[in-house]
Amino acid sequence: MTTFTKLSEQETPSISVHASRRISKINPNIYAGFTEHMGRCIYGGIYDPGNPLSDENGFRKDVLEALKELNIPVIRYPGGNFTATYHWIDGVGPKDQRPARPELAWLGTETNHFGTDEFMKWCELLGTEPYFCLNFGTGTLDEALAWVEYCNGTKDTYYANLRRKNGREEPYNIKYWALGNEVWGPWQVAQMTKEEYAHKAYQWAKALKLLDPSLKLILCGQDGTASWDYYTLKQCLLPAHSPLSTSTVPLIDMHSIHMYTCGSTHLPNVTAPLAAERAIEITSSLIDLAMIENGIPPDQPRPTICFDEWNVWDPLRAEGSKGAEESYTLSDALAVAIWLNVFVRKSKDVGMACIAQSVNVISPLMTTKDGIIKQTIWWPLYLFSKYMRGWTINAHVSCGAYEGETSPKWIRAVKDTPWLDVSATLGEDGYANVAVVNISDEKDMECKFEGATGDVTVFTVTGDSVSACNMKGKEEVGLTESTWDGKGAYKFPRHSLTLLRWKAE
């Protein structure tokens, strides 16, 4: 938890950190990823058979090794909008017998050469857990139940045996399943009203948990601030109505929300993720309201928020229909750092967050035929995933605030926009970690710092300007490491992310 006192521009900024004041446990799943059959994410990204850089499975070895550096706990698959017309059965069995299908989300052709078993093999090599999204467009409940049976079944049943026939004896035990993707959107095949979706989602959830009670089901929300979110939570945050169950545990475990941010200039761009912080706060209250109105006993688990699509994305700059290949700037990297600060600050409410996406498509990692490029946004992801774990701890920031235009405009009315955006954690290893984003593109911030004990390791991500970017053969934004004695004031460079780390006493 970070609190803020607004100062005049003439007053001296300060940050105080209290490592002994633990606020909430951070779920490591806030550093989750996302791979969709879109653009070059799968084909030409993680899967590129015939490329000299690929292994015997067709998986790009350089991509696997790079993503291991991010220590990604969960990866969402296969979409995204793609799921609304995807039939999982097309993507299993001998590849020469798999049908090619028209793909309606991005208007391509899906070969189905990469499907459930390939993805699971890739996850095992990466050391990550899968999160599957069900087809709520053209899919059926029977099809969804069959997919769960194929993945998790242990009995002598048809789809469990089909998995065994396809070479996998043991069940995959896939835990996380989403009840559709952005079903509210007019771009979706088989878009629904909130009333239609809530009825269908509850019935599917009931059946899925009868088949496998261990599943964690994720409800399809909107952006956390819409009537869709309230209505679907109210209708679906209920226990199963079944003669076989007297449980009072809600069928729904998490509520999904999506948001992408961008701004036409640096300061609206870098402050835009504060809209997500307000959306999390509103969604959290809607979850509480649904539990109260539905009479869910207080001893039952409280659903958390699954922010399973987030990133900086300007669709005009990187059109989805053309593969959404963003070229990220330092400004975007600082915005991603603030996104991550938000998830740390709101760790009590956020159970998972999936950056969209993990390779090539609005991604920190780009592939070429002969290598990879770590974009500017790679570095905040790397630092946060490596160090910002454990518990959120108390920090207080006193500094001036940006008072100009924001994107969206309503941020100005509901959130402070300090020049220094901060989150703080205490790791299992006993180290305190403080992430500070100086959003100013003009001014270094000399800041009184209280709470550091002993020598401080300092990691800095910055560049010559907010427009600096990384491309093949030219890395303008990277990571530097230094030390500080932890005494007095620290100067946070303009347009930078700084992570301070020390052994707490």
Swiss-Prot record:
Catalytic activity field: Hydrolysis of terminal non-reducing alpha-L-arabinofuranoside residues in alpha-L-arabinosides
Pathways involved: Glycan metabolism; L-arabinan degradation
Highest taxon of source: Eukaryota
Pfam families: Alpha-L-AF_C (PF06964)
Principal location listed in the UniProt entry: secreted
Single annotated GO MF: alpha-L-arabinofuranosidase activity
GO cellular component terms given for this protein: extracellular region
Compartments where found: Secreted
Entry-listed glycosylation sites: N81, N152, N269, N438
Protein family (similarity comment): Belongs to the glycosyl hydrolase 51 family.
Name of this chain's protein: Probable alpha-L-arabinofuranosidase C
Native species: Aspergillus fumigatus (strain ATCC MYA-4609 / CBS 101355 / FGSC A1100 / Af293)
